[in-house]
Amino acid sequence: MMRYACLKRQRYESGPLAVIPIREADMELIRVWRNAQMRVLRQSRPLSPEDQKRYFRDVVMPTFEQPQPPMLLFTYLLDDHPIGYGGLVHIDWENRRAEISFLLETARSREDADGEYARLFSCFLGL
């Protein structure tokens, strides 16, 4: 598992839900989720596998070593199975501010799913 140098803990959990530093193994899942949910993202075209690998290599991987990275991305797990990803982006370390990024797997992203989206988002924020 990749480790963020700036974090003391690499796993945060509550019952069956957990977040861990984003994993290279989850890149393809995340790409599929992003392409299926472009309407809620700042993404103008579908990502190719090469686009995703390049982004992970050039943008995400360097953040693991940085003492104050511009973002912290996590894989969101339910019973150790990935159900989404997100984290803090555009981090302003000096003023202790950031934006939240959050995306659930497509099947769980429907807002009419008996409040599941709201519940999972709330739990994610708590982790």
PLM region descriptions:
Residues 29, 71-75, 126:
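Residue-level detection of beta-strand scaffold positions
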Residues 29, 54-58, 124-125:
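Alpha-helical elements of Rossmann-like donor-binding domains used by nucleotide-donor carbohydrate transfer enzymes
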Residues 50-109:
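Acetyl-CoA-dependent GNAT
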